[in-house]
Amino acid sequence: MSLRLPQNPNAGLFKQGYNSYSNADGQIIKSIAAIRELHQMCLTSMGPCGRNKIIVNHLGKIIITNDAATMLRELDIVHPAVKVLVMATEQQKIDMGDGTNLVMILAGELLNVSEKLISMGLSAVEIIQGYNMARKFTLKELDEMVVGEITDKNDKNELLKMIKPVISSKKYGSEDILSELVSEAVSHVLPVAQQAGEIPYFNVDSIRVVKIMGGSLSNSTVIKGMVFNREPEGHVKSLSEDKKHKVAVFTCPLDIANTETKGTVLLHNAQEMLDFSKGEEKQIDAMMKEIADMGVECIVAGAGVGELALHYLNRYGILVLKVPSKFELRRLCRVCGATPLPRLGAPTPEELGLVETVKTMEIGGDRVTVFKQEQGEISRTSTIILRGATQNNLDDIERAIDDGVAAVKGLMKPSGGKLLPGAGATEIELISRITKYGERTPGLLQLAIKQFAVAFEVVPRTLAETAGLDVNEVLPNLYAAHNVTEPGAVKTDHLYKGVDIDGESDEGVKDIREENIYDMLATKKFAINVATEAATTVLSIDQIIMAKKAGGPRAPQGPRPGNWDQED
């Protein structure tokens, strides 16, 4: 009798090299275990006292951050179930800017508690149904827990209520300086609502960040206009402020056009050689004179600037700035109202832009060029100049500012101004309300609903752990503060009890109104929605089929042992 070797199921269906994992092999438990590893990594980075991670990506770049979306984007994750959560955090980052850690941690905790339900015998379908019922109930309860609303979106003090908690979750200790910078920059570009109830248009691209090494964070400033981290090319470094100046933007090189193929020129005598160079000079001189005759006083070049062209531009008193980034060119065109030109020549009046002033400033040891374009009190763009000791720290501060600016974008949505209690107070209140809802639900679905409520405990527990508090004391005190109403207190006073990360009280509980710690309703709703959908998506998968990767054999990553020229 011949020996029968075991074969992979569906071996004749797919090409050689595929992998298949089904629930019979315990794939859902393995997927939850893989997600748990990532969940534990992001857990310690949540909250104002969250720890940073040093990540070296595949290009060798060093990133220091505690933002979940940034960490997951730089990591080379290959597990397909984990990638579902990575996409969820990316969606939260794109739409809301803040709450990425909440999405990752809540989705991971929902899957952690679902593992217990699976071991009890509940099917994935029942867990998904219970989670969806609890999610709908949670979103309704959040509307009833609103404790404030930002009505005047042009008021800096009102904006600080929303910007400060977002930035403090990333850069705790520097939130006062950074939130002031962001609110000032936003107030420069945010148009005033013409009538009551009108939502002003806000573009996150209107806030730019320029990082300059040296100094400290307290030396950071906000400038109305656009700042480039380089100085003009020629002798003209600044333009006066007494009038508006015409600006021409070119995406082509400011130089003599060269042929794509090589050519040979035969010169018989010295006069022919002189005439050859004179023709080039006359051609460039004529082009620059045409531009100067149009009244252009500033040229922004997206490519190289030739020495001969620069000589004639200096003669005509035209300021020349080289901006290699096409994205910066696009923003500058929007600020000045100019049209980028792909050809070298005199622009038409419609293609020219206007700028109020262009000047060169020295900040630290660097020379920067400032383009100011103001319309009364409102500018089309505003730039935050950041100062710091290390490039990694400046990059992390820039990410915190981006989150604060994105929060302002969420504020401009129809229901974006509503605020919820922060510091874990909302989650503690949701636990009791969802648990009571689960007790009223008949059947096995109540088990999934109650576990959905248990998952929210991860937020206050993590805030207390990262702050160095005793979780076994803080959590019972929080539950007691939300369930006991003091005599003479307002009915909603218990909603304001959150985690005291500073440890000022013995109980570890504080009134969040003292520090104005609030969360945005729109951000919280979106995060709970995305996290629940990601968790239910992973639970609904019963089989993972992975095809063989395309491409040939890869070179080994590490160095070969022995001498480099040794033959095999």
From Swiss-Prot:
Localization, per the record, is: Cytoplasm
Query: Where exactly are the transmembrane stretches of this chain?
Result: none
Could you tell me the superkingdom of the organism this chain comes from? Eukaryota
At which residues is the cross-link Glycyl lysine isopeptide (Lys-Gly) (interchain with G-Cter in ubiquitin) found?
Answer: K15
Q: Which residues carry this modification: Phosphoserine?
A: S505
Q: Name one GO cellular component term.
A: cytoplasm
Keywords, alphabetical: ATP-binding, Chaperone, Cytoplasm, Isopeptide bond, Nucleotide-binding, Phosphoprotein, Ubl conjugation
Gene3D superfamilies referenced in this protein's UniProt entry, alphabetically: GroEL, GroEL-like equatorial domain, TCP-1-like chaperonin intermediate domain
Q: Is Transmembrane among the key words of this record?
A: no
> Which biological processes are named by the entry's GO terms?
chaperone mediated protein folding independent of cofactor; protein folding
Which InterPro entries does this chain map to?
Chap_CCT_theta (IPR012721), Chaperone_TCP-1 (IPR017998), Chaperonin_TCP-1_CS (IPR002194), Cpn60/GroEL/TCP-1 (IPR002423), GroEL-like_apical_dom_sf (IPR027409), GROEL-like_equatorial_sf (IPR027413), TCP-1-like_intermed_sf (IPR027410)
Q: Which GO terms describe its molecular function?
A: ATP binding; ATP hydrolysis activity; ATP-dependent protein folding chaperone; unfolded protein binding
Keyword Repressor (UniProt): no
Q: How does it assemble?
A: Heterooligomeric complex of about 850 to 900 kDa that forms two stacked rings, 12 to 16 nm in diameter.
UniProt lists the family membership as follows: Belongs to the TCP-1 chaperonin family.
Described by its record, this protein's role is as follows:
Molecular chaperone; assists the folding of proteins upon ATP hydrolysis. Known to play a role, in vitro, in the folding of actin and tubulin. In yeast may play a role in mitotic spindle formation.
Protein name (record): T-complex protein 1 subunit theta
Tell me what organism the protein belongs to. Saccharomyces cerevisiae (strain ATCC 204508 / S288c)
The top of its lineage is: Eukaryota, Fungi, Dikarya, Ascomycota, Saccharomycotina
Q: Which gene encodes it?
A: CCT8
